[in-house]
């Protein structure tokens, strides 16, 4: 498993006269994306700057898995969303990682007995 930076952009059927949540099929798209978050596939994500693109941190085996899963998005199937870029992302700062175990010599006597 690796982490990727995935940039999504507006597809050819995006209605520029509407806000993101007013686009056709918003509820279905939102449910789909919430499912990817619940599965641990999307770690974090959201619109960038003016909202023309969104950036997601995605945990996946490879680019093929990412493209396959995102192609099932109702917005992708409707032409509202396209994958603009997928890049491997070497996260050096990641709050999802567990804190290191404390060194035994730094524990108090009570803490040592509890371990």
Task: Give residue spans per PLM region.
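Conserved, structured core segments of small domains
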Residues: 1-115
């Amino acid at each position: 498993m690796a982490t990727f930076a995935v940039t999504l952009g507006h597809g050819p059927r995006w209605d520029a006269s509407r806000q993101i949540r007013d686009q056709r099929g918003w509820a279905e798209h939102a449910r789909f994306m919430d499912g990817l978050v619940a599965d641990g596939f999307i770690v974090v994500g959201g619109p960038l700057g003016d909202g023309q693109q969104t950036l997601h941190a995605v945990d996946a085996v490879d680019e093929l898995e990412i493209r396959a899963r995102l192609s099932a998005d109702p917005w992708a199937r409707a032409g509202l969303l396209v994958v603009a870029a997928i890049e491997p992302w070497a996260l050096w700062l990641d709050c999802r990682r567990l804190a290191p175990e404390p060194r035994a010599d730094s524990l108090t006597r009570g803490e040592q007995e509890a371990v």
